[in-house]
Amino acid sequence: MANYTGANVITAGDVTKYQPDAFGFGIASTDTEAVNFFAQTTNDILRQLRVEWWQTYKTNIFTDITILNTAEMVDTKVNLDQFERAGVYLFLGRFLCPALTKFRPETEKDRFERMGEFYMSEYNKEWRTILEDGVEYDETGDGTIQVSEREPLHGFRRLTR
């Protein structure tokens, strides 16, 4: 089932599939801090989509050039299920691990700094792969993704040289 609900990209269960002990270091999955991290992960993914992908999509899809500057991405039309792995990596790398680290510049990096760097690297790879494969955006709002509604970053309809 595709996630068009506007709910968060990931849940605590998704995180523990990739890092089973993630919530065993002092921040529980139900803590306000973790709940805020889940919401911020979703917001960051949607913002990055608007910045990196939406311009290509609307240029390739909308034929009426008068609406190109006014067309906004509708968050609930993005299938967030395709961002689960990227969301977990972003949650761990940008939010959870930095919240747990000691950040002592005079010493070696601690476990959480190294984990944060690893997960951000994995996030960047996963993000690129999703954009190259094609973002699922339900333009018609019918709850299904047609071939024409899956737009890669480079665009199918663009001449590439």
Regions found by a protein language model. Give the residues of each.
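Conserved short "hinge" loops at termini or chain/domain junctions
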Residues: 1-80, 138-161
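Short acidic, glycine/proline-enriched loop segments that cap or flank alpha-helices
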Residues: 75-83, 102-103, 107
